[in-house]
């Protein structure tokens, strides 16, 4: 299936990846889908901001803990792109994200069941943002097949792979307009 892509969003994705590479010369780009529960939860427009803030806090706590343990820590700045979509069949709101993290610390999502892995932190942060129990609803954070791509500064092939995978976030067909909520966002600086 071919999609129409928003060129402004594609440019913002490109700029975000380039900014991330300016900060960290070796990155892991990780795709994740965040779904909403069928139970009452905090699913307002600010849920994605709460998620990002919760994930940043977990990353910071993880790095501080590793430092206290005397382990080498590579300071990381979380860069990200997100898109809000509505399912084509059921029309249910969900989010797609690409997270960019320093590869020296996270070369993959890690063990999906381990709370201290990057995947575990993502699941916990999403449940925290929603205000739901992480033990019961952690499957709302979904990782597609082969969610991670590595890239390095001056690696045109890796850069193109990341942009091609991230194009999915810039597709127009499943966005809702006129709702007062943003359909797309990315980290700044």
Where in this protein do the model-derived segments appear?
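Histidine-centered divalent-metal-coordination microenvironment in nucleic-acid enzymes
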Residues: 79-106
């Amino acid at each position: 299936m071919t999609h129409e892509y928003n060129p402004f969003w594609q440019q913002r994705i490109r700029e975000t990846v380039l900014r991330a590479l300016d900060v960290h010369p070796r990155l892991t780009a990780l795709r994740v889908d965040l779904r909403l529960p069928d139970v009452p939860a905090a699913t307002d427009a600010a849920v994605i901001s709460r998620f990002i803030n919760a994930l940043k806090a977990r990353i910071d706590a993880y790095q501080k803990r590793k430092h206290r343990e005397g382990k080498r820590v590579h300071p990381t700045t979380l860069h990200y792109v997100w898109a809000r979509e509505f399912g084509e069949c059921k029309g249910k709101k969900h989010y797609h994200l690409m997270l960019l993290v320093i590869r020296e610390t996270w070369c993959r999502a890690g063990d999906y069941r381990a709370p201290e892995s990057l995947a575990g932190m993502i699941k916990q942060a999403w449940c925290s943002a929603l205000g739901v129990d992480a033990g019961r609803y952690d499957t709302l954070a979904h990782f597609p097949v082969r969610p991670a791509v590595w890239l390095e500064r001056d690696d045109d092939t890796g850069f193109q792979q990341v942009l091609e995978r991230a194009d999915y976030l810039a597709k127009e067909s499943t966005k809702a307009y006129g709702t007062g909520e943003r359909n797309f966002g990315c980290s700044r600086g």
